[in-house]
Amino acid sequence: MLLQGDEYNLKELNGRIVLFGGNSTIYPEEYVEIDKQNTNDKFIVAEVHRDIKQIKKETEKREEAAIYAVIIYKRLSDNIINRMRARDIRECLNHGEEEKALNCIVDCFDNSIYSIDYEDRMKISLIYAGDKADVKFGGEYLAENVTLSRGYVVFYNYCEKLQYISSFYNEIQEKLNFDMSREQVLRLYILGRYVKEPNDNGSICENDKNV
């Protein structure tokens, strides 16, 4: 199973499969849905917030649609942040202990998760800019020109997320046969966007569609 039984609710609403959290039995305001299109045999995966729908993926493969839906749902619902450690990071910086604050972060992860002061597209990258910091992943900013306190906490939080989804990807790769690359899964979870393979102009991102 991609999700544990107590992690989610799964219901059929108006002909669509709806995945949502909490114990509510009424129609949720925020959810992920899979809609089977009878006209073209495609499955459409969408993220819905208060009736605003963002289409994340269109595919003819049922299993691929299910995997996309699960990753999007986990991105919305998972709470994996260690708030006590984030507080410790801030306290170190408040006392001028920048190196200790950084060690408090990197000691939690191996170096496949992060890079310091240079950008690696497949890692969470902390880049110094004077007394400010940028945090990037996949060529995109997670935080730009923020204070070190803010930058370090964002850096730590996203390292946690990347470590978590990397482990999840390895787990589902062992259980399932699917076509999504590691980069696609990681970017979908971290950035919330579907990623195509590179095309002739080098673009790999497909914009979400609002409905």
Q: Where is each model-derived feature located?
A:
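Long alpha-helical, hydrophobic tracts
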Residues: 1-6, 32, 56-65
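Negatively charged, low-complexity tracts enriched in Asp/Glu with abundant Ser/Thr
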Residues: 1-24, 75-123, 128-130
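Surface-exposed polar/charged interaction patches
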Residues: 5-8, 72, 95, 108-111, ...
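Short aromatic-glycine-(Arg/Gly/Cys) micro-motifs in beta-strand/loop hairpins
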Residues: 23-54, 72, 128-139
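A short, exposed loop/beta-hairpin motif centered on an aromatic-Gly-Thr core
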Residues: 50-63, 140-145
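Long, terminal "pre-/pro-" and other extracytoplasmic accessory regions
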Residues: 55, 63-74, 79, 177
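A short, charged, amphipathic alpha-helix used as a generic interaction element across diverse proteins
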Residues: 60-73, 150-161
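A eukaryote-biased signal for long
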Residues: 125-211
